[in-house]
Amino acid sequence: MAAAVRQDLAQLMNSSGSHKDLAGKYRQILEKAIQLSGAEQLEALKAFVEAMVNENVSLVISRQLLTDFCTHLPNLPDSTAKEIYHFTLEKIQPRVISFEEQVASIRQHLASIYEKEEDWRNAAQVLVGIPLETGQKQYNVDYKLETYLKIARLYLEDDDPVQAEAYINRASLLQNESTNEQLQIHYKVCYARVLDYRRKFIEAAQRYNELSYKTIVHESERLEALKHALHCTILASAGQQRSRMLATLFKDERCQQLAAYGILEKMYLDRIIRGNQLQEFAAMLMPHQKATTADGSSILDRAVIEHNLLSASKLYNNITFEELGALLEIPAAKAEKIASQMITEGRMNGFIDQIDGIVHFETREALPTWDKQIQSLCFQVNNLLEKISQTAPEWTAQAMEAQMAQ
């Protein structure tokens, strides 16, 4: 049967007639090829592609029929469709400028097959082949934005945040031009994930936190975004930016529903966190967040050591490296190195006396500390009152009335 299809195509290519008549006849041959199965179907479809890219066939007919051809392929078995897609792309390549729209459609379908197979890298590379900026066809902003975001997401799935960042940066140039709110949300999610994978945790936390307030996002997904914001904040390097983010999250009542709230509370209140208190939280982290740093410690260990060092600076005026190491549960030399780095980067106030082996913390003003403690107390009292009103609303109402009557 494949031979019959090839023969019909050869006869039709040498015949004359109106574009409409010829297109109708080619369409009948395509339908015949689609009805076949197995190897016969594969050979017949390949013959059809070869005929369509032949220069003897009018470009008007070729484009129209290849578009029809692309609509049929998603209904075929994935293995057959994948082979046909690759064959078609190879045959079209010498005349790719003439078939840009059809090539884009083929690449989108082929990427979907690779995605179903969880072959993320090949899926991304197939989409990269669409000439969104360099081709003759003018693609609309939403199509380009959606494609760039899909490429970035696929590279993230393949654990390649560098390539993902390259394509999210291209999407950044387009997202302000799009009015599609759903795409805007996808952009923000993808950008937050890229920052997260690139270990830019505080920027990722800010993006996730912003997403957690978007009403267009489902409530469960908003809470998921808030959870990611909290995790990224805990993993971020200690400093003013992180302190501000901790304060923002601690004041957000939704965070009390999250499993990591206990760690958040300790960090916000500048309490020392012990290693055995981190096991449950460490189990919640994603694989890329469990990576080790240059000194061999995990990202979480490093973040907690820096937090504990900052907390110690608010408890002591000065401390020896030996005592600091014991407090942080690390060797004295490592404690000195981290303290030195934090002071140099302006993330902690103080200076190091290497002769005596002491780190001196600069005296902090008492008022801001008192303010923070009072603020924390008021916050906890408010939470307590809310819980009482939820448990005993009638008693609360009576107590309020009695208070007002005094």
Curated annotation (Swiss-Prot):
The modification N-acetylalanine is found at residue 2. It comes from the Eukaryota. Residues 197-366 form the PCI domain. The keyword Cytoplasm applies. GO terms for cellular component: cell junction; COP9 signalosome; cytoplasm; cytosol; nuclear speck; nucleoplasm; nucleus; synaptic vesicle. Keywords: Acetylation, Cytoplasm, Cytoplasmic vesicle, Nucleus, Signalosome, Synapse. Its main location: cytoplasm. The keyword Acetylation applies. Gene3D superfamilies: Winged helix-like DNA-binding domain superfamily/Winged helix DNA-binding domain. The modification N6-acetyllysine is found at residue 25. GO terms for molecular function: deNEDDylase activity. It is found in: Cytoplasm; Nucleus; Cytoplasmic vesicle, Secretory vesicle, Synaptic vesicle. Pfam families: CSN4_RPN5_eIF3a (PF18420), PCI (PF01399), PSMD12-CSN4_N (PF22241). Belongs to the CSN4 family. Component of the CSN complex, composed of COPS1/GPS1, COPS2, COPS3, COPS4, COPS5, COPS6, COPS7 (COPS7A or COPS7B), COPS8 and COPS9 isoform 1. In the complex, it probably interacts directly with COPS1, COPS2, COPS3, COPS5, COPS6, COPS7 (COPS7A or COPS7B) and COPS8. Interacts with TOR1A; the interaction is direct and associates TOR1A and SNAPIN with the CSN complex. Interacts with STON2; controls STON2 neddylation levels. Interacts with ERCC6. Component of the COP9 signalosome complex (CSN), a complex involved in various cellular and developmental processes. The CSN complex is an essential regulator of the ubiquitin (Ubl) conjugation pathway by mediating the deneddylation of the cullin subunits of SCF-type E3 ligase complexes, leading to decrease the Ubl ligase activity of SCF-type complexes such as SCF, CSA or DDB2. Also involved in the deneddylation of non-cullin subunits such as STON2. This is COP9 signalosome complex subunit 4. It comes from Homo sapiens (Human).
